[in-house]
Amino acid sequence: MSTETETHLGESKRVILSSLIKQLSPNKEIKHMVLPCFLLQPRSTLESFTDMFTYIDELYKINEIDDEGERFLQFVKFYLTGWHTRPKGICKPFNPVIGEEFECFWSNNKNEDLPHIDELIEDNNSDVGVFKAEQISHHPPLSAYVFYNKFQKILVNGNICPSYVKFMGNSAESHLQGILEFNFFKWNECFECTLPTVGVKGIILGKLSPFTCGDIEIKSKNSKYSCKLEFLFKGLFGSSKNINGIKGTILYDNKPIYKVRGNWDKQIFIKKINEIAGTHGGSSSGSHTNSTERCLMDVSLLKNSKEKYTKPIEQQPPNSSYHLWELVTKNINNNNDKETAEEKAKIEEKQRKEESERREKGILWEPKEFHFKENPNNEYKTTFYYNDIPKLFDNLQSKPIQ
């Protein structure tokens, strides 16, 4: 059974939290509120998007599967591996400033590869994963990112815009709006997925703990497979089964073929639906009877074989997350709330001043690494794509996305 991650606050911090709550009205969006420093993670939201790639080998395994039904199941598994990897507790990462960038890498040998990383990422035969993110706008807080591995022929384009936090009385939540596109050029296949709602509950009553809830959809743009999942929410009096619970359906041609159940921090199971079992759903599942559940994901068996790493901070640009938030991060790690608040305020004031100057001069902010492309066929119309996509995969017959 899954368990909630409870956060214990000292009396002084509870008093600060209570004073903040008194300023809020239930069911209202929180657009302007400075969080106390003890509620901050020592990292930027841009870096937090890499949590999804913690078990990157599960992503690469998709390339090894011939059957399209099994590939889809493997992608669903990969999608679900990223949720339990977030830092425990109720702290949230920094809100990125406009123009902020974050870059990191995955490869088999960090120590050997890092000194030559710029050359390696240009080499089509080097198995290196590259992640780049940029903060596109501040209001709304839109972030865009790209992940690519030229050797694996995988490209991911992500656009995420967290909604303003909504205070619900005993909880506060934010829906992660946006679309993630995963391209596997070996199979000429693209999977598209949405994101759930994240938040904190137990603000007034019960355990103070994080939660994930809401509906998401995963679909193949090249086959008839799709998946609808619900991240379950356990309220003050809800069933303990709903703690980090998930349920849903995997479909083929809009017809259910698997039921999904479990907990994303423990195990997730799929079970064929009898009426149409055996018609679709992947060749390797043939050894399972219609009444037998199959374990799609077991967190205890996942292996983190490739370490995420970044260039040394002195080699990063001034607008990198590590540069911008260096002093804030240092003070959070030293439990120095006063210095944290002062350094954070300096960054936010600088951003406000620069935005005001641009408005006065009529200058529109232009992203450096991404460009806007209207996507009428996409539920999420405001989509930004990485500028260098055509250069990355110019050896392929069909140009990706663009």
Swiss-Prot record:
Q: Where is this region: Disordered?
A: 333-366
Composition bias, Basic and acidic residues: 336-366
Q: Name one GO cellular component term.
A: cytosol
Q: Which InterPro entries match?
A: OSBP_sf, Oxysterol-bd, Oxysterol-bd_CS
Question: What superkingdom does the record give?
Answer: Eukaryota
Single GO MF annotation: sterol binding
Q: Which family does it belong to?
A: Belongs to the OSBP family.
Q: What is this protein called?
A: Oxysterol-binding protein 12
Please tell me the species this chain comes from: Dictyostelium discoideum
Per the UniProt record, the lineage of the source organism begins with: Eukaryota, Amoebozoa, Evosea, Eumycetozoa, Dictyostelia
Q: What would be the name of the gene that encodes this protein? A: osbL
